[in-house]
Regions:
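Alpha-helical scaffolding within the catalytic cores
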Residues: 1, 32-33, 59-72, 92-103, ...
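Structural recognition of the beta-strand scaffold that forms the well-ordered cores
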Residues: 10-14, 19, 48-53, 77-82, ...
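Cell-envelope and extracellular/periplasmic
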Residues: 17, 51-62, 73, 77-88, ...
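Extracytoplasmic/secreted cell-surface and envelope-processing proteins
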Residues: 22-23, 59-60, 86-97, 122-127, ...
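Active-site segments of SGNH/GDSL-like serine hydrolases
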Residues: 81, 85, 101-139
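Catalytic His-Asp segment of secreted/periplasmic serine-dependent ester chemistry enzymes
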Residues: 123-224
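Conserved catalytic region of serine esterases and O-acyltransferases that act on ester linkages
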Residues: 187-350
Length: 350
């Protein structure tokens, strides 16, 4: 164990806005930073904590940014948080989440802890009657992968509701809104993780240190996302372009995308070689215009709406643009006004 030997360790928080620190009043109040501080206090070592949380992103986005936001930092421990943002009941998230776990475990020097958060329905800051109901998260879709790879799971959300249902606390005691923990909630989540780590440390002499062999097959049988990556404005050059320029869209932590600032709209076309799927197109708040996505001359999406009231979103294309063999694709994006698009998610043959 590197920390016990006095070596510097690196921890990556990988997830959505909770990991990013929403509703925590300072970085040292975020659950990931508190876990990092536990290592500093326990082992008196240097700890690098890398916050790779991005608000409103899912494991589908995560698997496309894993190289840049996880592996580039050579982590010793990754705290994985996507169980809130992956839509409850949407089975499409099973495969990207499994691939996140599997890709990290393939780096045999890296450990994982899956952290489970959640939200409430009918939120009320004043706890009025018939408010703050427990909402579903995607634990039921993620749990088979967690168990299959024997990943430690800290179910903060499930444990929290046992206290709420017993009348010990209210949702608003530990949350800053309908979904994000307050400083108190971040501390509780970190304390649960640190309790697990303390138990591991206390029983370290009895733990088999042999790195387990990954199962040969994926649990859900779909390895399409194993090669997932983002292609951004610095990676590919359009073959035709009208009114789009390369640029960061609202400062989000992803690669540069392309922005159209012309009120009459524009179009941009890319040729991408030998892909097995065009996984998604990211879009971000730049205006109220509508865009269309066309792949190999066929309309895939005709009404991509970049809503000015949101920070952005993404369009899932795997179901519509997926190939049995590596295929060259021509991708065109058209819009009728100001619009911003993020990097293009693709997968390649292994």
């Amino acid at each position: 164990m590197k920390a016990k030997r006095g070596e510097t360790i690196t921890i990556v928080g990988f997830g959505g806005s909770i990991t990013e620190g929403a509703k925590a009043t300072s970085s040292d109040k975020q659950y990931g930073e508190i876990v990092a501080q536990w290592f500093r206090d326990t082992f008196d070592v240097n700890v690098n904590y890398v916050n790779s949380g991005i608000g409103s992103t899912t494991s589908l986005v995560g698997i496309h940014r894993i190289e840049e936001h996880v592996f580039a930092h050579n982590p010793d421990l990754v705290l994985v948080d996507f169980t809130t943002n992956d839509s409850a009941g949407d089975e499409r998230y099973r495969s990207p989440y499994e691939t996140v776990l599997r890709r990290i475990l393939e780096d045999t020097d890296t450990a994982i802890i899956s952290v489970v958060f959640g939200a409430v329905s009918n939120y009320s800051a004043d706890n009025v009657a018939n408010s703050n109901y427990r909402a579903n998260n995607s634990l039921s879709a993620h749990l088979p992968s967690m168990l299959y790879y024997d990943v430690p799971v800290i179910d903060y959300y499930g444990s929290l509701w046992r206290y709420i249902n017993a009348g010990v606390i209210k949702w608003t005691d530990v949350a800053g809104d309908y979904i994000h923990p307050s400083n108190t909630g971040h501390l509780m989540a970190a304390s649960a993780i640190n309790c697990y780590l303390s138990d591991v440390l206390a029983n370290l002499d009895d733990i088999d240190t042999t790195v387990p062999t990954l199962p040969e097959d994926y649990f859900f049988g779909d390895d399409i996302y194993e090669t997932a990556t983002f292609l951004g404005g610095d990676d590919i050059v359009p073959v035709s372009n009208s009114n789009f320029t390369v640029g960061k869209v609202h400062g989000i932590k992803l690669k540069k995308g392309w922005v159209c600032t012309n009120n009459t709209g524009g179009s941009i076309t890319f040729e991408i070689k030998a892909v097995t799927s065009l996984t998604l197109y990211l879009q971000y708040k730049e205006g109220n215009s509508v865009g269309g996505i066309y792949v190999n001359g066929k309309t895939v999406i005709s009404n991509a709406n970049c809503n000015n009231s949101s920070t952005g979103g993404y369009i899932w294309l795997t179901d519509q643009v997926r190939f049995d063999e590596p295929t060259d694709v021509t991708v065109t994006f058209k819009c009728n006004g100001v619009f911003g698009i993020g990097p293009i998610g693709v997968t390649y043959a292994k």
